[in-house]
């Protein structure tokens, strides 16, 4: 028995001393939303900011509790990598509303959705990220890097109301994609050869053409390399997004805040 334990310890030590695969990484996990809050308004161009509604409260949207989240990188040089990430939140609702609100039709004309109107709604919120990371300090113990890239938000909101004022008017749906540049900072610290904790943060504030946007995203996590090519991880993540669009036919305002826990499996080659 002692010989078997000694052999197992020797094998583990030898494996720990082997270089960790680090050229390609893929993370797949579940993002459990502890908090999701948002506000949206779509009004005629000259009205101003208008009154925002909460899709969850006003429209009865049932936001998913856990969503799929994918992240990863391709390290084409020891200090240079391409990064990517995606997750999406989808929801539908059907509610007889108890507070009237304003919207617009496809021509930009104001519409009132009165109390007791039955509203069928849908929300699709997708986040895509692609970027470049420069690890200006990269050792077996610590990786510290900065990067830049694109944060691409796709927002689609569909509404259909049984009663409108003026009557029988279609509602202007929201379907927009906003690619905005981000700046990122990454810190990875190996407590042991197999265990690390990490911090990733991204941010931007930008105005261009008809768009104004701001975004921040922070993830703090830890990861255990259970096998040479497979790791198990957990983390806490939060982000906030604000976008404004001034179109010829409408003004769109949208902001949301998301926070939650991430559990995942990662593979490395």
PLM segments and residue spans:
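Repeated loop/turn-to-beta-strand initiation elements of outer-membrane beta-barrel proteins
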Residues: 79-82, 140-142, 193-197, 229-232
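Structural signature of Gram-negative outer-membrane beta-barrels, strongest in the C-terminal barrel
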Residues: 198, 218-219
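Transmembrane beta-barrel architecture of outer-membrane proteins
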Residues: 23, 65-69, 125-129, 143, ...
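Residues on the lipid-exposed face of transmembrane beta-strands in outer-membrane beta-barrel proteins
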Residues: 28-30, 70-74, 130-134, 148-150, ...
């Amino acid at each position: 028995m002692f010989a078997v334990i000694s052999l197992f310890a020797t094998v583990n030590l030898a494996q720990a001393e082997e270089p960790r695969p680090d050229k390609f990484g893929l993370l797949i996990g579940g993002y459990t939303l502890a908090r999701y809050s948002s506000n949206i308004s779509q009004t005629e161009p000259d009205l101003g900011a208008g009154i925002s509604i909460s899709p969850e409260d006003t429209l009865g949207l049932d936001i998913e509790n856990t969503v799929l989240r994918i992240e990863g990188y391709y390290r084409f040089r020891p200090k240079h990598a391409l990064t990517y990430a995606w997750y999406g939140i989808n929801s539908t609702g059907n509610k007889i509303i108890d507070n009237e609100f304003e919207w617009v039709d496809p021509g930009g004309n104001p519409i009132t959705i009165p109390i007791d109107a039955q509203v069928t709604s849908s929300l699709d919120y997708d986040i895509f990220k692609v970027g470049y990371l420069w690890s200006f300090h990269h050792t077996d113990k610590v990786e510290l890097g900065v990067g830049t890239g694109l944060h691409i938000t796709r927002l689609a909101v569909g509404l259909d109301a049984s009663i409108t004022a003026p009557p029988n008017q279609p509602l202007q749906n929201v379907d927009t994609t906003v690619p905005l540049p981000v700046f990122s900072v990454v810190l990875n610290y190996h407590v042991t050869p197999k265990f690390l904790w990490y911090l990733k943060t991204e941010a931007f504030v930008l105005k261009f053409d008809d768009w104004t946007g701001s975004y921040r995203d922070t993830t703090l996590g830890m990861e255990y390399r259970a096998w040479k090519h497979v790791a198990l991880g957990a983390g806490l993540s939060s982000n906030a997004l604000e976008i404004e669009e001034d179109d010829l036919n409408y003004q769109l305002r949208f902001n949301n805040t998301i926070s939650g826990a991430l559990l995942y499996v990662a593979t490395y080659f």
